[in-house]
């Protein structure tokens, strides 16, 4: 189902690119405000709409692990219906930084994962809207995440939950039989990994930068038990980052990272961490765990021969 939806989005981008020459200018904005897509997204039928259209499309993606595998299957399936469309995927490791720079210069392509650096109010400066929210809300979860003034500029390709990706074999070797449920136990388990294995207990991926934002996701429901905390209560709290006696709340999240580094439970030199390389390292048991999200699990499983060790 998701592949079908992604192909539909590519079709939308194809028609928009044909109508607006999206991404072909050198100005800050890569859209033609007067041009409109020839067919509305809600009216498109994959395999039926505009099958005779010719175009060349470049798609920027942060999923460097899929460029030469799954995405090639997407292209083949799409070309079976649209043989005159040439699609090229370009994977970018430091996605937010590089994609933002290229958006600003206008030299980026036709379709991309919208960088987190783009403010919602600026979406129309770089992208064509693909429809009104009403066209998507009953079909897609989180369709409002890249929306401004009820106009949708991007739809999600997946939904994730925050968490800790870990190597089960490393935890077992360290004698950890139950997963930690509080910061104190988590730090104690990292200490066990340090003492009883050769693995780096907690790998921060500091050098990549964007990976550290995974910690920010914890300050909401994960740290407070309140799903409304981050969006509705954080900004109205007098001292939201104060230390609580029960070690809940945002302070506990960032303090856990601070204590892990302070106690030497992370890599020796955080400036030399390697995002792509960490996938093989955790798969091979050289890393105990990383704070990321559910999206990272399959990438770490594909990093080596020990997929069953990753959870």
Model-derived regions, located:
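Hinge/lid segment of periplasmic solute-binding proteins
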Residues: 34-49, 115-162, 169, 187, ...
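Short, solvent-exposed loop/beta-turn-alpha elements that line the ligand-binding surface or hinge
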Residues: 129-140, 222-252, 302-305
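Short, well-ordered beta-strand elements
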Residues: 39-43, 52-65, 85-90, 111, ...
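Glycine-centered hinge/linker elements that transmit conformational signals in sensory
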Residues: 190-191, 235-270
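Periplasmic solute-binding protein
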Residues: 122-124, 142-179, 205-236
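Extracytoplasmic "Venus flytrap"/periplasmic binding protein-like
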Residues: 77-141, 169-181, 281, 288-289
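Short, low-complexity disordered leader/linker segments with a strong preference
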Residues: 1-57, 80, 136
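Extracytoplasmic/periplasmic substrate-binding proteins
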Residues: 58-62, 119, 255-311
């Amino acid at each position: 189902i998701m592949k079908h939806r992604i192909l539909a989005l590519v079709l939308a981008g194809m028609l928009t690119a044909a109508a607006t020459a999206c991404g072909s200018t050198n100005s800050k904005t890569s859209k033609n405000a007067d041009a409109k897509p020839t067919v509305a997204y809600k009216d498109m039928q994959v395999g039926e709409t505009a099958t005779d259209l010719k175009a060349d499309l470049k798609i920027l993606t942060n999923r460097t692990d899929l460029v030469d595998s799954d995405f090639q299957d997407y292209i083949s399936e799409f070309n079976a219906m649209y043989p005159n469309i040439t699609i090229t995927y370009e994977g970018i490791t430091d996605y937010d930084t590089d994609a933002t720079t290229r958006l600003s210069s206008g030299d980026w392509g036709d379709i991309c994962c919208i960088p987190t650096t783009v403010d919602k109010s600026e979406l129309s400066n770089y992208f064509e809207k693909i429809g009104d929210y009403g066209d998507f809300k009953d079909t897609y979860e989180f369709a409002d995440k890249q929306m401004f003034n009820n106009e949708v500029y991007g739809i999600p390709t997946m939904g994730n939950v925050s968490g800790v990706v870990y190597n089960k074999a490393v935890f077992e070797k360290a004698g950890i039989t139950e997963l930690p449920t509080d910061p104190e136990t988590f730090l104690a388990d990292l200490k066990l990994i340090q003492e009883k294995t050769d693995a780096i207990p907690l790998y921060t991926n500091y050098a990549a930068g964007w990976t550290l934002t995974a910690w920010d996701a914890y300050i909401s429901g994960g740290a407070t038990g309140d799903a409304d905390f981050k969006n509705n209560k954080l900004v109205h709290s007098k001292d939201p980052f104060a230390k609580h006696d029960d070690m809940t709340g945002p302070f506990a999240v960032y303090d856990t990272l601070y204590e892990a580094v302070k106690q030497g439970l992370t890599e020796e030199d955080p400036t030399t961490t390697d995002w792509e390389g960490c996938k093989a390292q955790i798969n091979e048991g050289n890393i105990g765990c990383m704070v990321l999200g559910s999206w990272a699990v399959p990438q770490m499983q594909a990093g080596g021969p020990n997929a069953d060790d990753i959870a």
